[in-house]
């Protein structure tokens, strides 16, 4: 097997030129690149994959050690940090950047449409959009400023689907796996799957994935989808749904798709004097303040907001690392999570 030295000798160049060819052939003259390429194919040389070094700021391309959190107004700061699930999301983003000693600053678009001068590539390494201006002209100016900066959009931004940025979908199968694992860790043997609100989506990917994962792990499940006529009044709907649920024997887990269903059913159970703390449950859309309404509640997962925050931070680091090669902005968004409490 030929090595770099032999290839360099046959091509009549030095080893540094051959090394540059393998790193990026555009750094080598076209005629030299063709000569080296022909020799490589002739001798059957295969470049061994280099072991990736530690993920240091220098390797990633961090220069300013500063990332901006873009908000539409100052009131959003108080709103986000008083909202339990979203607070965990943003805190997770902060924690990931702190591991690399990267600070985060708020960049607030003024009510008059002014955009802080700090939002520029000479001041920050990247940006995380939590909310955007509703005025089209201001949003367009903001996008123009962001196109020179590595940027990640988030599910917190109500306008994230109204622009030309790429979309990275959050895998609903992963939520299903975590849900089933959650019940398994609690030693729950049987769960009840509550339908989408008013049975609008009978073949929800999240529920289908949860069924498959429960079957694999060995957790029995009962699906209440279709068990109650969706056309009955809402209060009657939850009463009948609760009636069906209470007939399921040995059910220790409750899997909700919407927090509206969870709120309706748990209210009905509590009105009947049933202690809901005996159940382990999860809701795909449940946020902490919804659960706090019931006082002390059993363990739950609240849509993986923390994991989504970690994913957002890592996505931005990837964007900073490859920004020169892929100058595009990406959106971290989960269709299943769009209906936030």
Task: Kindly give the residue locations of the regions a language model identified.
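N-terminal helix-turn-helix DNA-binding module of bacterial transcription factors
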Residues: 1-56
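Bacterial carbohydrate/catabolite-sensing allosteric modules
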Residues: 4, 10, 41-44, 49, ...
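Short boundary motifs at domain starts and secondary-structure transition points
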Residues: 54-61, 118-119
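Interdomain hinge and pocket-entrance segments immediately C-terminal to HTH DNA-binding domains
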Residues: 58-79
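Surface-exposed acidic loop/strand-edge motifs in secreted or periplasmic proteins
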Residues: 108
